[in-house]
Amino acid sequence: MSKSTSTPNPQNEKLKALQLTIDKLEKTYGKGTVMKLSDEVVMDVPVISTGSLGLDIALGIGGLPKGRIVEIYGPESSGKTTLSMHCIAEAQKAGGIAAFIDAEHAFDKTYAEKLGIDTTNLLISQPDNGEQALEIAEHLIRSGAIDIIVIDSVAALVPKAEIEGEMGDSKMGLQARLMSQALRKLTGAINKTGCCCIFINQLREKIGVMFGNPETTTGGNALKFYASVRLDIRRIGQIKESADNITGNRTKVKVVKNKMAPPFKVIEFDIMYGEGISKIGEIIDLGVELGIINKAGSWFSYEGTKLGQGRDAVRTVFLDNPEMQDEIELKIRQKVQLSGVPAAMEAKELEEEEA
């Protein structure tokens, strides 16, 4: 009898060789080093709320993505640090550990506490130079214990050579080189550990720009490329109780870059002095926008009940009736399909469960 010889299938041989290589790589570098996209169902991106309901909606995923780099930039006193502090407070509320690299040496503990930050459990560092700041950040991120880290600000990350040099010395491109090198090292660690890394940045103007926007951010172009989300925050007006009494700022945030959802969304909210982002103001604005609160002229009403004339009157009603505020917030979240439950409702549910 003649034996039938089967010819080897080149495709099978390729797949075998590929599997052997993957097994070898996983043995060396750990499981999941190389995998097919079909091997694992892509889960929703874990996020940290920004503390602004409108901004969470504008970001498309419900907040800032974990395991990614975020840049918040804008002019002076526009609310950059306030927004990042709200992110820290939200991360802490969710049981996370937060760190703040204060390169500007301007951290205000009292203000941070007013925004809801638990300062007793906040890790803070005030480094002497840019290299030290980024090394501290790298070690904290690589520990795998940090959920959110804020670096305030890129402009204050002064290279060691510049600090040690004379006042008039030219140090062209030193900071840009430092940022580029640091981001190359940090990106992988940030992604692996699932830490949300926020860089606060300042604006500068390019000299001699005749056409287009002369504004640019400090620290070179590296951060623009490495950031998954870039937020442009600006003050657009003042909130006054009377002609002489200014109580806050009207603020506009534009999602300039977003790798997680469609970008270029714009949101406006109030930042009140000593309070931060006004949650009530946002609920009123979003409630009207989504048709949950009815507005006729200057009068506001909800489910047939008149709330008052003007935003300030509605604000007072919500302060006296937090249950109504939470109910409207829940309806807003359901309408835009945003996960999460208002904090007061969550606390009430926990109390009921314990009872």
Swiss-Prot record:
Main location: cytoplasm
Keyword DNA damage belongs to the record: yes
GO molecular function: ATP binding; ATP hydrolysis activity; ATP-dependent DNA damage sensor activity; damaged DNA binding; single-stranded DNA binding
Location of the protein in the cell: Cytoplasm
Biological-process GO terms, alphabetical: DNA recombination; DNA repair; SOS response
Membrane-traversing stretches: none
Taxonomic superkingdom: Bacteria
Pfam families (UniProt xref): RecA, RecA_C
Keyword Ribosomal protein annotated: no
One GO CC term on file: cytosol
Alphabetized SMART domains for the sequence: AAA
InterPro entries for this protein: AAA+_ATPase (IPR003593), DNA_recomb/repair_RecA (IPR013765), DNA_recomb/repair_RecA_CS (IPR020584), P-loop_NTPase (IPR027417), RecA-like_C (IPR049261), RecA-like_N (IPR049428), RecA_ATP-bd (IPR020588), RecA_C_sf (IPR023400)
Annotated NCBIfam families: tigrfam_recA
Family membership noted in the UniProt record: Belongs to the RecA family.
Stated role: Can catalyze the hydrolysis of ATP in the presence of single-stranded DNA, the ATP-dependent uptake of single-stranded DNA by duplex DNA, and the ATP-dependent hybridization of homologous single-stranded DNAs. It interacts with LexA causing its activation and leading to its autocatalytic cleavage.
Protein name per UniProt: Protein RecA
Biological source species: Cytophaga hutchinsonii (strain ATCC 33406 / DSM 1761 / CIP 103989 / NBRC 15051 / NCIMB 9469 / D465)
Name of the gene encoding the protein in the UniProt record: recA
